[in-house]
A protein has these predicted regions:
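Sec/SRP-type N-terminal targeting helices
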Residues: 83, 99, 144-172, 222, ...
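Terminal intrinsically disordered/low-complexity segments used for targeting and assembly
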Residues: 2-76, 158, 242-289, 331, ...
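Periplasmic alpha-helical coiled-coil/stalk elements that build and connect Gram-negative outer-membrane
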Residues: 159, 166-283, 393, 397, ...
Length: 484
C-alpha cells in the first residue's frame, strides 16, 4: 500500500510538472489604439465636400468603355491576380488540413506474406517448412481534443484564410487603381502631345516668316537661326511626348498581363475624372472597415493569437484511441472464417516530459504574434498618413490650379489682343506667334497640374479602400480582443 501511494504521488508530480506551460513566454507588443484615426486633427479639420465611399467598381463612373474592358481583362489574366488566387488556394488548403484533425484516421490493410521457416523457428525442429499468412482488416485511431488545441489551430487557419481573401480583394484594388492611374496619365500625355504639336506648328510658322523677311532683307540671318533652333527644340519636345504616350500604353498592357500587341490597340482615353475633393462623412471612423490592408492585418493578429493557444495545449496530456479489426489466416480459403477473426483496442495517454522543443515552438508562435501586431500597428499608422498626405496634396494642387488657371486666362487674353492688333495692321504676325507661345506654356502648366490632381484623386480612392468593405459580422470577429 505504501509503495502504491508513493508511486501515485510521484506520478501526480510528474503530471503536474509536465502540464505546466511556461508563464514567462508571452507577447510584448500591443495593438495600437484605433481611436488614433478618430483623433486625427488633419482629417477632422479638412474642408471637404461630403460624398459616399467609393464603390467596388468605382471606375465605371468614368464612362470609358475601353478602360472598363482593360480592367476586366486584367482581373482575369494579370499575374498579380494569379498570385493572389494561388495564395488564397493555399490558405484554403491549410484550413482543410486543420479541419481534418477533427476526424478519425481510418485505413484499410491487405497483405500476403510467404516465408520459409528455419529449423530454429519450426516448433517440430524439422525446418524446410513453408507458410503463407493472409491479412485483411481495418485500422483506425482518434485523438481526443481535450484541451482545444486542434480547435485553436483550425481557427488560426480560418483567420489566415480570411486574411488571404482580403488580400485577394486588395490585389484587385491595387491593380485596378494602377490601371486607372496609368490611364489618366495617358489621357494627359495625349493632351501634352497636342500642345507640343501646336507649339511645333507655331515655331515652323516663325521659321517661314523669318525666312521670307530675310529674303527681302528685312531681318538678319541670326534671327533665322534662332527661329530654326526653336523649331528643332519644339520637334524634340513633340517626340518626347509621343514616346511618353507609347510607354504609357505599354505600361497599361503590362498591368493587364498582355504584351505590346495590346498596347497598339489602346486608343486615346475618353475618361473624365471628377476632380472635386470629396470624402465620406464617416471618415475616419469607418476607415478600418474600408481598408483591406488593415482588415487583413487584424485577421493575421487573430490567427497568431490562436496559434499561441494551440501551442500551449501541447504541454498537456494527450489521449489517443487506436483500434484494429480484420482477418488473419494461414489458409486462403479460411480467411473469412470465424477462427481467423482478430481485433484489438488500445487507449493511450502521452505526456511530454522534456519540453524544450515545445518551448521553442511557443516562443516562435509568440514572436509571430508580436510580428503580426507590429505589422497591424504599422499598417494602421500608414493608412492615416496616406489619407492625410492625399488630402494635403489635393488641397495644395487645388490652390496651384487657381494660379495656373489665372495665368492661362491672362495669356489667352494677351494672345487675342495681339491677334486683333495684327488684324488691324498695328502689329506683326511674329508678335502673335510669340504671344501664342506664352499661351501654350500656360496651357501646358495647367495640364500638368490637372494631371496631378486627377492622379491624386485616384490615389485617394485607393487610400479609402478602393471599394472594399468588411461586413459587420466579420468586423466584429476581427476586432475581438486578444487575451495574451
Amino acid at each position: 500500500m505504501m509503495k502504491y501511494t508513493k508511486l501515485t504521488a510521484v506520478a501526480s508530480m510528474v503530471l503536474l510538472y509536465g502540464c505546466a506551460a511556461p508563464s514567462n513566454i508571452k507577447p510584448t507588443n500591443q495593438l495600437a489604439d484605433q481611436t488614433i484615426l478618430e483623433h486625427s486633427q488633419n482629417l477632422r479639420d479638412s474642408q471637404l465636400t461630403p460624398a459616399v465611399w467609393p464603390a467596388q467598381d468605382w471606375w465605371v463612373v468614368l464612362n470609358d468603355r475601353q478602360l472598363e474592358n482593360l480592367i476586366d481583362l486584367a482581373l482575369k489574366n494579370s499575374p498579380d491576380m494569379q498570385l493572389a488566387n494561388a495564395s488564397l488556394k493555399n490558405a484554403s488548403a491549410m484550413v482543410m488540413a486543420a479541419d481534418a484533425q477533427f476526424d478519425p484516421s481510418v485505413s484499410a490493410d491487405a497483405s500476403l506474406s510467404r516465408a520459409r521457416l528455419s529449423r530454429s523457428q519450426d516448433y517440430s525442429f524439422q525446418g524446410h517448412r513453408y507458410g503463407t499468412i493472409y491479412n485483411l482488416g481495418l485500422s483506425g485511431s482518434y485523438s481526443f481534443d481535450l484541451w482545444g488545441g486542434e480547435r485553436d489551430a483550425w481557427e488560426g487557419a480560418v483567420n489566415n484564410q480570411r486574411a488571404a481573401q482580403v488580400d485577394h480583394q486588395a490585389a484587385r484594388i491595387t491593380l485596378s487603381t494602377a490601371i486607372v492611374q496609368s490611364y489618366v496619365q495617358l489621357a494627359n500625355a495625349y493632351a501634352l502631345q497636342d500642345l507640343a504639336q501646336k507649339d511645333l506648328d507655331r515655331t515652323n510658322r516663325i521659321v517661314d516668316i523669318t525666312s521670307r523677311l530675310l529674303k527681302h532683307g528685312l531681318t538678319s540671318e541670326d534671327r533665322l537661326y534662332t527661329a530654326q533652333s526653336g523649331a528643332a527644340a519644339a520637334k524634340q519636345t513633340l517626340k518626347k511626348r509621343e514616346l511618353a504616350v507609347s510607354q504609357l500604353k505599354n505600361a497599361i498592357a503590362t498591368l493587364v498581363g498582355q504584351g505590346p500587341d495590346l498596347a497598339s490597340t489602346i486608343h486615346r482615353p475618353s475618361a473624365h475624372i471628377d476632380t472635386e475633393l470629396a470624402l465620406p462623412r464617416e471618415l475616419p471612423a469607418n476607415l478600418l472597415a474600408h481598408r483591406p490592408d488593415i482588415v487583413a492585418a487584424k485577421w493575421r493578429v487573430e490567427a497568431s493569437s490562436k496559434e499561441i493557444d494551440s501551442a500551449k495545449t501541447r504541454f498537456y496530456p494527450n489521449v489517443n484511441l487506436s483500434a484494429t479489426a480484420g482477418f488473419k489466416a494461414m489458409l486462403g480459403d479460411a480467411v473469412f472464417g470465424e477462427p481467423s477473426q482478430a481485433w484489438s483496442v488500445q487507449p493511450a495517454i502521452s505526456l511530454p516530459l522534456f519540453t524544450t522543443g515545445l518551448k521553442a515552438n511557443l516562443i516562435e508562435k509568440t514572436a509571430g504574434y508580436d510580428s503580426a501586431v507590429a505589422q497591424y500597428n504599422k499598417t494602421l499608422v500608414n493608412a492615416l498618413g496616406e489619407v492625410s498626405d492625399n488630402i494635403l496634396a489635393m488641397q495644395s494642387i487645388e490652390m496651384q490650379l487657381d494660379d495656373a488657371h489665372q495665368s492661362m486666362n491672362l495669356a489667352d487674353k494677351s494672345y487675342h489682343i495681339t491677334e486683333k492688333r495684327y488684324e488691324a495692321g498695328m502689329g506683326s504676325q511674329l508678335e502673335v506667334l510669340m504671344a501664342e507661345q506664352q499661351l501654350i506654356q500656360a496651357e501646358s502648366s495647367f495640364t500638368l497640374l490637372k494631371n496631378q490632381q486627377q492622379e491624386q484623386q485616384v490615389l485617394l480612392v485607393r487610400s479609402l479602400g478602393g471599394g472594399f468593405y468588411q461586413a459587420p459580422e466579420a468586423k466584429q470577429a476581427a476586432t475581438s480582443s486578444s487575451t495574451h
